[in-house]
Amino acid sequence: MAFPLKAETILILGDSLSASYGMEEKDGWINLLRPRLEGHTLVSGAVSGETSAGGLRRLPALLESAKPDAVLVMLGGNDGLRGFSPAELKKNLTKIIDLSQASGARVLLSEVMVPTNYGPRYAKAFAEVYAELGALPGVTLMPFFMTGIITDPQLMQRDGIHPNEAAQPKIADFMQPWFVSVLENRPKA
């Protein structure tokens, strides 16, 4: 892989799906991805239980301390699980994108899917938030990284929400080309 000569920093602003929930941090996908992106720095800003509002509150300090070249936004799952308004999610994610871009960082936005028990109208409105924001200038939209994992009980913890340790290498495999794309400063095809 040909990376830019400049080492870059990517901040992952996420929730428990990125925070190694239910396992040691060393076994999580972020840590597994680090050696594959040698010379670059992955900063975990993932906190279990985080909502888009919580991520927005924490973001200025994370941008100041990490000074990232790119921000991977992986928030919304807890907003959906709590039945928060898609309009509120959109407002928070828009501010996260704006703050990240104002700091000079490129933005990679991960789609998030909500459980089907919330009904098709809520799920559609929720998905539309990501589609709309992913179309903004300077934002790369990444498909939901749990697709293919969440339906496999062998890859999920007993709660049916969080990926287990066996899923972490698969998530790292999924993430790697997206991170490379961001590091090469071009949208992924």
Q: Model-derived features: where do they sit?
A:
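Alpha-helical cap/lid subdomain in secreted, periplasmic
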Residues: 5, 32-38, 56-189
